[in-house]
Amino acid sequence: MNMEYTLSILKPDVIKRNIIGKVNTYIENSGLKIIAQKTLLLTKVQAENFYIIHKDRAYYQSLVQNMTSGPVVVQVLYGLNAVKKYREIIGATNPCDAKKGTIRGDIAKSIDENTVHGSDSLENADIEIKFFFALIEYAYL
């Protein structure tokens, strides 16, 4: 039984469409707990640094532009196998490929406005959470 933390980011399209609660319902219905949450407006430098691993990809500048186009909601999720579970409920990166019943399959508009970011590994979850949160903001026993 692996109790884990993972990072979730609700992207600007979620806030613009006023569907934060709808996305949170998917998270809560999966059994994951939202133990920390805050709304931020990322600067270009912050977005570039957060997504630095994608720097050489063709979509990098578009991703940075999207992530700085409005507020985001960053969350720390906690639960059994949280990284894997959240990746499953998110669905495929391209909403066209995402299964129904997943966040992206049900509510994402496009690959650019694909609703959420979720950590892809336990190691990246640790790095990504620390990018946005101090330990005191999310320590959960």
UniProtKB/Swiss-Prot annotation:
It is an enzyme of class 2 (transferase). Keywords: ATP-binding, Cytoplasm, Kinase, Magnesium, Metal-binding, Nucleotide metabolism, Nucleotide-binding, Phosphoprotein, Transferase. The keyword Iron does not apply. The active site is at 117 (pros-phosphohistidine intermediate). Its main location: cytoplasm. It catalyses: a 2'-deoxyribonucleoside 5'-diphosphate + ATP = a 2'-deoxyribonucleoside 5'-triphosphate + ADP; a ribonucleoside 5'-diphosphate + ATP = a ribonucleoside 5'-triphosphate + ADP. ATP binds at residues 11, 59, 87, 93, 104, 114. GO terms for cellular component: cytoplasm. The keyword Metal-binding applies. One of its GO terms (biological process) is UTP biosynthetic process. Its cofactor is Mg(2+). Its EC number is 2.7.4.6. It is found in: Cytoplasm. GO terms for molecular function: ATP binding; metal ion binding; nucleoside diphosphate kinase activity. Belongs to the NDK family. Major role in the synthesis of nucleoside triphosphates other than ATP. The ATP gamma phosphate is transferred to the NDP beta phosphate via a ping-pong mechanism, using a phosphorylated active-site intermediate. PANTHER family: NUCLEOSIDE DIPHOSPHATE KINASE (PTHR46161), NUCLEOSIDE DIPHOSPHATE KINASE DDB_G0292928-RELATED (PTHR46161:SF3). NCBIfam families: PRK00668.1 (NF001908). Homotetramer. This is Nucleoside diphosphate kinase. It comes from Orientia tsutsugamushi (strain Boryong). The gene is ndk.
